């Protein structure tokens, strides 16, 4: 699927990838669900998230927290309270530390709670997307607080693209489980 360039495409991509991800999740075996994620033997998987996330709940919570970042950022800036997407004390160079904080915060959250939280937050994201026009979402310079990008690109990154990331990780875990 190509990167969305309209509100309809954005909503379609977000919901389609979310459904694809949920179909993949529904197909995970008990063994795949109960086996901790371990990508330490794959030298190509160097990014911090390959070590951070240990189970499906961790991935779902990561997606949920990035929805929350997006929702807070859009709402605050629409109200005239200009904040950056990545909240202080973090920035685009240190957001990995923020992701670890999200991970720590949710170690007592159950998988079912995480799934419910993610579904609810996706619904909120879609409702906010619907408030904007195509121009507001996909034209540069409409909102100063977006910087040199488009508002829509943030929505794509926090939804459809992030679900792709999750599916890639889940498929890698499934492959690891099959090898063992």
Tell where the protein language model's regions lie, with residue ranges.
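A short small-residue
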Residues: 1-2, 43-47, 98-106
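Short secondary-structure junction/hinge motifs that connect adjacent elements
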Residues: 27-46
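Short, contiguous alpha-helical
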Residues: 40-97, 131, 136-180
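Acidic/histidine-rich alpha-helical segments that form the ligand environment
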Residues: 91-138
């Amino acid at each position: 699927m190509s990167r969305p360039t309209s509100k309809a495409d954005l909503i379609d991509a977000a919901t389609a990838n979310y459904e694809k991800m949920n179909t993949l999740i529904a197909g995970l075996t008990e063994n795949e669900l109960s086996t901790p994620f371990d990508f330490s033997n794959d030298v190509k998987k160097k990014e911090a998230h390959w070590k951070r996330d240990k189970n499906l709940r961790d991935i779902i919570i990561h997606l949920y927290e990035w929805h929350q970042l997006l929702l807070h950022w859009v709402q605050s800036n629409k109200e005239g309270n200009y904040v950056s997407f990545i909240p202080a004390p973090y920035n685009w160079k240190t957001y990995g530390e923020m992701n670890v904080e999200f991970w720590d915060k949710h170690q007592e959250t159950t998988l079912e709670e995480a799934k419910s939280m993610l579904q609810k937050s996706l619904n909120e994201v879609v409702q906010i997307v619907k408030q904007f026009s195509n121009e507001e979402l996909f034209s540069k310079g409409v909102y100063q607080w977006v910087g040199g990008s488009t508002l829509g690109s943030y929505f794509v990154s926090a939804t459809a693209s992030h679900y792709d990331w999750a599916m890639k990780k889940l498929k890698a875990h499934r492959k690891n489980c099959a090898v063992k």
